[in-house]
Every structure is written in structure tokens, then in C-alpha cells.
A protein has these predicted regions:
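Residues located in well-ordered beta-strands
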Residues: 2, 13, 18, 31, ...
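Glycine-rich beta-strand-centered segment in the early N-terminal region that forms part
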Residues: 20-35, 48-97, 101-102, 128, ...
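Short glycine-rich anion-binding loops that position phosphate/pyrophosphate groups of nucleotides
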Residues: 35-37, 257-258
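Cytochrome P450 core scaffold surrounding the K-helix E-X-X-R motif
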Residues: 40-46
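NAD(P)H dinucleotide-binding glycine-rich loop of Rossmann-like/cofactor-binding domains
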Residues: 92-184
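N-terminal Rossmann-fold NAD(P) dinucleotide-binding loop
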Residues: 190-191
Length: 284
């Protein structure tokens, strides 16, 4: 099969690799029909992710068709069209039982702080990813979800990571009816977080960025108010002005991690919780 393979920092190429096989009775083999490139894949490409080994296949956002199932798999059948979440989890350990599946104890032999992730180095288990023609899916009864016939592939693939991350960020904010929500960053995850905030009852949603194209999408796609931080000396002060000097009830930070170190947050002191850091692995 063909796969996108890591060959060192700033070096990736499409190569021939063996088609993966069932290694455990709970495995499934999925033929990939669509894969996406995540912004975090750049961390691998730039050589910033520890223990990214030569020959590793990238890709943690993919959908496909089940080609083979192990003898213990009960919920999937050959021919099922499925979306596969980016993280791998057993569904039964202490963490999984408490909804913390990205910290699963049974899927990563190389670390204890994080569970398994497809195509994201041996630090997260060394599982080859979905930027390939086929992928082995462990614990196939736990992660994959059948895609309804009416859903297009281009929509379904967003559910593997980007859409789920934005929604989860809003969910972690414990938004209540009428809350003012500020979303920092108007990229895809930020836009989905803004849309999700409305679904959870927000009374106002304000998106902060400086790229005009993204701010325009925040207005047209997420129906949010927008703030261009290039136009203000102090964004926190400006946000407080726009909220009767109370600040936001919830802040969802959808920027790259290096962007928010040591910064003040425009949070209402009544809020009772810290800002939500949008991350599939480490909610703040």
C-alpha cells in the first residue's frame, strides 16, 4: 500500500509499506477513503515531537471502510463505513471509565501521561496513522463509529478530531444559559467551539483574531461578534469594556499553545473556573 512516511525533520514522502494485518482479536483493518492533515501534524514534520521514528506513518484524522475484523470484534462488520477518532482507548480502564479516554492506561506501552494516538509518534504508542491506504484499528469495538448514509465523507472526517475538539472545549467550559463566551482564535477549531457555544446556551459569543478572512468566517459561520486584536493595545481591557467590565463567563483558547503562555485572560471573576484550553489531550 502507499503511505505518508516520516523520514526526518522536514522530510516526508509517499512510500510503499506492507498492508497492516490483524494482530489481536479486537483489531479491525480499515481501508482509508479520506484523510485530513491536522495543524498538529506540523509538530511531527518539524521534528518537535519526541520519539518520532523514521518510517512512521502520519495521520490521525481519517475515515474509511472496514475490510477485516478480529475474532472478538462484535460491533463492526466488513463493509461498514466508519469514522475513527484520533485517540485509541480500551474503554474499560480507570481513565476510560471516567471519560478520560485520551489517558487510557492500556494502549501506550511507551508513556503513562498520555494514551494512544494514530500517526503521532512512539510517544503516543507508535501506531501508524491514516494518511495511508489501510490502517490497523485496535479496540475496534470502542472507537470507530458508523457513518450514516446521508453524511458526506468531507463532513464525517471533521468528527475525527477538529469538530470534536471544538465541541469538547465548549463542553468543558460548563456554559450556562446566557453566558458570554470569548473564543481566542478563529481557525477551524475555534469556529466550531463558537458554534458549539451557541448550542450550549451562550447569550453572546465573541471571537478574537487578527486575520480578516477568519474573522469574516466567524461572523458568517458562527454568527459571532468579532474583535481584531491588532486594532487594540490591550485586548483584555477592550473585552471588559464590551462586557460592562465584567469580562467573559467562559474563555475557550483555540490558539497554538505557544501563543498563550503567561497571558492574562478576560474572565469574569465570578466564573469559578479557569479558562478552557482547547486540546484533545490536556484540557486546562
Amino acid at each position: 500500500m502507499r503511505a505518508m512516511v516520516y523520514r526526518g525533520p522536514y522530510k516526508v514522502r509517499v512510500e510503499d509499506k506492507d498492508v497492516p494485518a490483524v494482530e489481536h482479536p479486537n483489531d479491525a483493518i480499515v481501508r482509508v477513503t479520506l484523510a485530513a492533515i491536522c495543524g498538529s501534524d506540523l509538530h511531527l514534520y518539524h521534528g518537535l515531537m519526541p520519539d518520532t521514528r523514521i518510517g512512521h506513518t502520519f495521520g490521525h484524522e481519517f475515515i474509511g471502510v472496514v475490510e477485516q475484523v478480529g475474532s472478538s470484534v462484535q460491533n463492526l462488520q466488513v463493509g461498514d463505513r466508519v469514522m475513527v477518532p484520533f485517540n485509541i482507548s480500551c474503554g474499560s480502564c480507570w481513565f476510560c471509565a471516567r471519560g478520560l479516554s485520551s489517558n487510557c492506561h492500556n494502549v501506550n506501552p511507551n508513556a503513562t501521561a498520555v494514551g494512544g494516538i494514530y500517526g503521532y509518534s512512539h510517544t503516543t504508542g507508535g501506531y501508524d496513522g491514516g494518511q495511508s491506504q489501510y490502517v490497523r484499528v485496535p479496540f475496534a469495538d470502542v472507537g470507530p463509529v458508523r457513518i450514516p448514509d446521508w453524511m458526506h465523507d468531507e463532513d464525517a472526517v471533521l468528527l475525527t478530531d477538529a469538530a470534536a475538539t471544538g465541541y469538547f472545549g465548549a463542553q468543558l467550559g460548563d456554559i450556562v444559559e446566557g453566558d458570554t463566551v470569548v473564543v481566542l482564535g478563529a481557525g477551524p477549531v475555534g469556529l466550531i467551539a463558537a458554534q458549539s457555544s451557541w448550542l450550549m446556551g451562550a447569550g453572546r459569543v465573541i471571537v478574537v483574531d487578527h486575520l480578516q478572512e477568519r474573522l469574516a468566517k466567524a461572523r458568517s459561520m458562527a454568527y459571532a461578534e468579532t474583535l481584531d486584536y491588532d486594532e487594540h493595545d490591550d485586548v483584555v481591557v477592550e473585552l471588559k469594556k464590551q462586557t460592562d467590565f465584567l469580562g467573559a463567563d467562559v474563555v475557550i483558547d483555540a490558539r497554538a499553545p505557544e501563543r498563550y503562555r503567561g497571558e492574562r485572560e478576560p474572565v469574569d471573576p465570578r466564573a469559578g473556573h479557569v479558562p478552557t484550553r482547547v486540546s484533545g489531550i490536556r484540557p486546562w
